[in-house]
Amino acid sequence: MRANIPTVSDDAVELLVRNEAAQIIAVSEDKDRLSDYQIFLSDFPREDILGMSIGKRRIYISHKLAKLASKRVSYLWLLRQTLAHEVAHETAGHAMQNGLTWFNRRTLGPGISSVDVGLPQSVTLRNYSVDKELEADSKGLGYWERLGWDCRIWVRILEGFEKQNYAGDVFHPTEKRLQQARGICLREEKDGVI
């Protein structure tokens, strides 16, 4: 069964997202493959889904997040965090590991379901493991460092999730993500990066 995640067309917001993604891709392992990236906007039924990568350099970003990012700098940083995380999934090849595409393995727990992203219930999704999610955060923070972006902003975003009692889901545990980000940021401080 071929399934497509529903997308939204919004030229002004798409331009913002593409420009932000281009900065990140330019400092990534894919710096010579910018034109291969396809970035789509989607109104995910589950509002806490900010973005996702599905392989072959295809990334979906929450339309709501992108609209807010065009108006408020705090959301712009959240968009940048989301893009860096999703680009990192792509550069790490997470969607294609084990010879299985993102759409053809069952979720093994309460992660993101097909319905959460606007697909029929008959479509099964494969969530990335916690280790792969943490790897994407780590690589994403590396892109931020290369761009000269302050890692403390990444940490504050996760602290904001924690203050709102948003624990994430089984594959995106806020506490583990925050602990890792603090450690990476502390190393950057010690190395004189920030």
Question: Across the structure, where does each feature detected by a protein language model lie?
Answer:
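A Zn2+-metalloprotease active-site environment signal
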Residues: M1-I194
